[in-house]
Amino acid sequence: MRILLLSALFLSLTTLVLSADLGIEKTHVVECNRKTTKGDTVHMHYRGTLAADGSEFDSSYGRNQPLKFKLGAGRVIKGWDEGLLDMCVGEKRTLTIPPEYGYGERGIGPIPGGATLIFETELVQIEGVNNDEL
């Protein structure tokens, strides 16, 4: 009985730790009937900064062009594939993405290895979904 209880406690703590890795803050909540799911092609506006010093490394707003990609297909960092699920069009979220959900220890371009990333995101469109479905 004691081993069973300890096993259950360990699994609960492991789940808690894993779910705490990716920070998701809903900054503008929108109610809808159709939320994003794996496989959706989405259009996202975003602003990416380094948590360490707040410096901006990329932004779709400056280009006035949202990023289009297939959600959950591994075409973006893991923090986006997981952190942008269950969103409504018009919703805004701030994602705090640790290195293991971002670019890891290798980094890329202006993003150093081991960096925690902050993304301000806004869901602009889910392709193939009509306004009356939202």
From Swiss-Prot:
UniProt-listed PROSITE patterns: FKBP_PPIASE (PS50059)
Motif range (Prevents secretion from ER): 131-134
Regulation of protein activity: Inhibited by both FK506 and rapamycin.
GO biological process, any: chaperone-mediated protein folding
GO molecular function: peptidyl-prolyl cis-trans isomerase activity
Keyword set, alphabetical order: Endoplasmic reticulum, Isomerase, Rotamase, Signal
Keyword check for Endoplasmic reticulum: yes
Main location as per UniProt: endoplasmic reticulum
Localization in the cell: Endoplasmic reticulum
Record-level GO cellular component terms: endoplasmic reticulum
PANTHER family from the UniProt entry: PEPTIDYLPROLYL ISOMERASE
Similarity field: Belongs to the FKBP-type PPIase family. FKBP2 subfamily.
Protein name: FK506-binding protein 2
Gene field: fpr2
